[in-house]
């Protein structure tokens, strides 16, 4: 079956078509085997909080809306979340931005308005949060992580990635390093513990190895496994890279 083939391809089954211990763990996660494999790798690479956000995002329809009649406006609004290095990290920017708005104590109506402003589907954001919570709880029950490590705390304004703070005031210029109070100092320590690009992408590769390709020298096409060919989505931050 496709499910067994997927599991075997991600070392979830052995040559006798029996589930390995890894396969048994993958089967407990209510998501695609490829995404489940990524989630299990997150423990090894110490990036569980970040991968829980990304894995749940990859398991639902993209929360970003791109209506035909306002495509350019939507693209401009989505620039707030863009990460120039990785489309996967853009999911973290969306998640963190939404979490900060929730933490302000906004009403449901205000959150809906915020989503509309940035062309995000509020329904899909809610679906994302629900699946994230489900995956986090399952990961905790499986002993993959702890409650403290599973739930990502959004960076403070001082810790925003440069890509996420586009269009905002240059807060970094306002920071006076010599006058950091204790709260800001603790925030810097938390930021230092945040999983980095390499950790996150090493985990992602365990489930998405078939998506790795070599760019054609004469265009935007890529050659992947078994001679497959694909190209980047035009809305990707890497499309023109």
Locate predicted features.
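Second RecA-like catalytic domain
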Residues: 1-241
């Amino acid at each position: 079956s496709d499910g067994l083939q997927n599991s075997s391809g991600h070392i979830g089954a052995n040559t006798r078509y029996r589930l390995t211990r890894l396969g048994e763990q993958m089967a407990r996660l209510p998501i695609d085997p490829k995404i489940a494999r990524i989630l299990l790798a997150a423990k090894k690479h110490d990036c569980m909080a970040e991968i829980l956000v990304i894995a749940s995002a990859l398991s639902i329809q993209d929360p970003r809306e791109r209506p035909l009649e306002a495509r350019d406006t939507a693209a401009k609004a989505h620039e707030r979340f863009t990460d120039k290095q990785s489309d996967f990290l853009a999911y973290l920017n969306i998640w963190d931005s939404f979490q900060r708005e929730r933490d302000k104590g906004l009403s449901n109506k205000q959150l809906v308005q915020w989503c509309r402003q940035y062309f995000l589907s509020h329904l899909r954001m809610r679906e994302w949060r629900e699946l994230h919570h489900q995956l986090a709880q399952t990961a905790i029950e499986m002993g993959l992580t702890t409650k403290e490590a599973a739930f990502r705390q959004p960076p403070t304004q001082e810790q925003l990635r440069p890509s996420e703070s586009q269009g905002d005031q240059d807060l970094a210029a306002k920071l006076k390093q010599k006058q950091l109070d204790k709260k800001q100092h603790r925030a810097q320590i938390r930021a230092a513990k945040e999983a980095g690009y390499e950790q996150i992408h090493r985990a992602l590769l365990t489930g998405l190895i078939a998506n790795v390709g070599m760019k054609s020298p004469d265009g935007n096409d890529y050659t992947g496994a078994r001679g497959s060919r694909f190209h980047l989505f035009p809305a990707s931050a890497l499309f023109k890279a």
